[in-house]
Amino acid sequence: MRRFSWLWLWLAVACGTSSSGVKPVSSPDPQAPCVGGHLTWNLQISDQRAERSDTPRVVGLIRDSLSRSLPGCRWSDSAQSENGTITIELHRFGTTTDGAVWEASAEWDVWARNPAGQTLTEFEATGEASRPNYRGENSERVAMQHALEEAMGKTLAGLRALSTGG
């Protein structure tokens, strides 16, 4: 029976979600508290990954990161026709390991559209990180945090480049 308890413990650790313990990114720019000359945006985040067991957590990380980094923006979940829409389509957010190194990746596509539905910008944001499996550290979480920070940095740069005339 003791042998089976170790098996269950190993399975629980191996099947844990890579988003666990990852914190939202906060990178506000006092010169650009919101983007595109608008204060309110509709925000739609969809998870297109094959494995979606941690969807609420990952979507929350992305939403919180945008809110903290663009504190002048108000975000609406409902598609209000008078607001532009920022859409994020999540493709990868996870880690793999060979036992010695953790590989983390975050990847999503971003679109910003004006209230008429015209595309203002579209781009891909990716982040990748490798981290040796150090003892006494959650190397999986550290690698995933770095990948999120890189992908969110690209997202913010792309959104902040929006013209204020849109």
What residues fall within each predicted segment?
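Short secondary-structure boundary motifs at beta->alpha junctions and helix caps
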Residues: 50-56, 114-165
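Flexible, charged surface loops at secondary-structure boundaries
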Residues: 34-36, 78-82
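Short glycine-aromatic motifs
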Residues: 75-77, 161
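A structural "domain/chain start" motif
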Residues: 15-68, 160-166
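Sec-dependent bacterial lipoprotein signal peptides
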Residues: 1-13
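Surface-exposed short loop/turn segments
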Residues: 17-21, 73, 80-122, 126-138, ...
